[in-house]
């Protein structure tokens, strides 16, 4: 029996593959698209406010020098048939109005009657032009909020399952972000509510209040911060005053200039790479948490560590002028006077299982870096760490 082998050239094989792909595309129903656009403008004055609620799209704001809010909404629906795409388009209603000093735009989606919605999608994008100082409430679900480089009005922002990209806020700001990322510039007086935020980047801030859960924050410079963080990570390059609760988290501070109060350091780690010699106080209460502090060797201060029964208290690199160890009732209390100092004080409540480490920073000569670097930048690189000078990406867990 003779067997004939047919050898196909690469060109023939490629033609055959392309033919199969084309046949597959022909067999698959073509996607149909239906669109509509809504535009409306309203005159506004000082004291007025904009309110927007949207889903399945983005809110993009730009500023102009007119006393008018211009709202343009682009709606697009995709489906396997034109009829089905049109049905979905008709389900989406955009209501805009002005009552008193409130300009509002709300997306409403009627309930779907047919549960078979495979290969169907909708996109609802808002494009808003408004005066820079107009106050605004923006609420976006399943999409992003994009704001200009400078925002001068009071802002109330809610974004879920999406990202916030914004510049500076010169007025009060309230930001709620869940299941996304945020990146903002400078903040004056702001409150942040964060949940499952992969990366929250803040450039500079004057006064911040943050409630963070399962989120990661990166802050460059801040004057005053009140914060509760659970199950996350915090990196701050420079801060003056901190009042915190840290639970099941890791926190790193580059430079602490003035005061720190941690009411609960629970199952967490807090590291301060450069405590200013002019600091006023450091108070930390630990519940299975660890504190590490570094400051210049010639700083005059005191260390008080209490209830350290099963804990470690490590102090090194300083001129210890007085040390007292009290093991009455087996609580193990430590007191150190560094360079003759009685104030200010690093006070650490170990609650038996928290660990404290206080060490002297290395001098510029010991660090061995190039002398051409500026002193302030040089010290930051030595003591704050390179990780604080570079962006860090985190993955949502």
Range-by-range predicted roles:
Residues 1-385, 391-397:
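Intrinsically disordered, low-complexity terminal regions
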